[in-house]
Amino acid sequence: MIVLIQRVAEASVSVEGRVTGAVGRGLLALVCGEPGDTPAVIGKLARKTARLRIFEDEAGRMNRSVVDVGGDVLCVSQFTLVADTMSGNRPSFSRAAPPEEGLAAFNAFVTALRGEGLSCSTGEFGAHMRVSLVNDGPATFSLHLRADGAGAD
């Protein structure tokens, strides 16, 4: 699973002109399931997302998590995070989980974040979405963990 986290002042996602999710101060998490994602992988990435200290404390240092600051998370599925762009000019998405597996992984990630005490809004899996955000920083972090244990934590 890959999770691209952006610290935001606010963010929203809409499908066909209808807002499906919105947050104020918090995180926008772009999420991509990969084949073989396990509950352990998904849980670890959700915990890391919830606990990553990327918000400033009183001294101006990144020392607080989204939980610490009372922020929310907007989760948006984005299979293009696994794009292979090394060969030719058209990206390949063959490393993305199949749709039904990707949906299950995405839903499990959102459930795990809620289990960490976070309020989560979402986009609509598989839909063409418009995402609006106001970056705070900007501060963007890429988390990637595979079922075989490879990847950053």
Set out the residue ranges of the language-model regions.
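A short, glycine/Asx- and small/polar-enriched loop/turn
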Residues: 71-73, 133-138
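GST superfamily/GST-like fold recognition
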Residues: 119, 126, 130-134
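Residue-level signal for inorganic ion chemistry
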Residues: 45, 76, 139
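Short, low-complexity, polybasic intrinsically disordered segments
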Residues: 93-96, 136-153
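Compact, glycine-rich, soluble single-domain proteins
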Residues: 18-70, 80-111, 116, 121
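RNA/tRNA-interacting regions in translation and RNA-turnover enzymes
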Residues: 9-11
